[in-house]
Amino acid sequence: MDEKNPEAVPRPPEQNTELVPPKKSKSKKPANILIYLIDRHLGRPRNDMDLFEWVWTLK
């Protein structure tokens, strides 16, 4: 057997096995006016003045 130049067997690249936690939203602001109105009706007020002024102008 000839062992002068053993051929290197390429290894497959290692996969990243670290689990990355999903990013969580830092604020609980409503995504749209419908969510804002439903939350307001259910007694979960938000401190979003722009939406409050928009709702106030509809009255």
Curated annotation (Swiss-Prot):
Tissues expressing this chain: Specifically expressed in testis.
Domain of life: Eukaryota
Region (Disordered): 1-28
Protein name per UniProt: Embryonic testis differentiation protein
Designated gene of the protein: Etd
